[in-house]
């Protein structure tokens, strides 16, 4: 039977796929942290708060066109949550991409507080 966490991730996933920044922001805490899959070591680029999220999506639309997430699954291991997914699209150079990824999540007060992202690196 679905519960509040399932509903949260269903809303979050739909909003993410549509790049609906305000709906995504409604699913995360005010102090939300997103550790991107690229950037400076060790954590990659770290976005902080809803404003960091909004700024990323305004830039991301220029970097990745037609990004589409599929095969998304949420998995629970005790109090830990992780999501697996496939993302396809076109990068900033116009080259198509197709990758699998995983996100590690922390939940606080019924919202997503941390999204730590990892993608397969394909040559």
Where are these regions (language model features)?
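Generic N-terminal helix/loop capping motif
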Residues: 15, 31, 35, 60-63
């Amino acid at each position: 039977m679905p519960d509040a966490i399932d509903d949260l991730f269903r809303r979050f996933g739909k909003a993410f796929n549509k790049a609906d920044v305000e709906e995504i922001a409604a699913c995360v805490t005010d102090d939300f942290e997103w550790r991107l899959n690229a950037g400076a070591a060790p954590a990659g680029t770290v976005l902080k708060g809803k404003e960091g999220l909004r700024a990323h999506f305004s830039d991301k639309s220029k970097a990745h066109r037609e990004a589409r997430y599929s095969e998304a699954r949420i998995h629970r291991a005790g109090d830990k949550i992780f999501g697996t997914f496939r993302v396809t699209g076109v990068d900033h150079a116009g080259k198509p991409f197709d990758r699998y990824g995983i996100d590690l999540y922390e939940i606080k007060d019924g919202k997503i507080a941390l999204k730590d992202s990892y993608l397969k690196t394909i040559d």
